[in-house]
Amino acid sequence: MKVTYHGHSVITVETKDHHIIFDPFLTGNSLTDIKPEDVKADVILLTHGHNDHVGDTEQIAKQNNALVIAPNELAVYLGWKGLNVHPMHIGGSRQFDFGKVKLTQAFHGSAITDEENKTITYTGMPAGILLTVEDKTIFHAGDTALFSDMKLIGELNHIDLAFLPIGDNFTMGPEDAKLAAEWLRAKQVVPVHYNTFPVIEQDPEAFADSLPGGVGKVMSVGETIEL
């Protein structure tokens, strides 16, 4: 299984038979290395409805006939746009042909903002996502604050790779993310959601170096690791 980082919170997972993408914010993402028209994906996983996470979901889903898996209200909203969706909710899990998906808590917001019409559409609760494929588990925390039940997530799951936001301001910052990494007990921790905008500028290397046992890893944009 190949896992690639594409800037901000965009992650792709490639298996023998499937191409999966998390939170495909590409248009307007100054850090990304890919364009929406070039994305090959049969599954799109969304943590919440903010524009910098839903991103190019509609275009990618339609050009690939991809399945979009998202928290319930967000899935319903995207279904109304003609996308093939599967709604889930916090604590729920489901086995799909590509692997198992489970949604966890995330402490954040979730809404789609239309700047032109000055409207905000509520899209339910935000989530983290546990993806288990080929006996490996990836945890994408989405946008979140630190919360104590991360200990429980770590106790109940053997996490091989965790993606944690460190940007601060809108999510937890490096200090809280360090504690999250400890509680989650992941074998490897990669920082995300930083340096896309001035307000979330951080030093990812300093964060990775602060984690004990060499579990911290900074993935450069376009870098791939194998699990």
From Swiss-Prot:
Family: Belongs to the UPF0173 family.
Organism: Bacillus subtilis (strain 168)
Cross-referenced Gene3D superfamilies: Ribonuclease Z/Hydroxyacylglutathione hydrolase-like (3.60.15.10)
Hydrolase among keywords: yes
Keywords: Hydrolase
GO MF terms, alphabetically ordered: hydrolase activity
TM ranges: none
Pfam families: Lactamase_B_2
Listed name of the protein: UPF0173 metal-dependent hydrolase YtkL
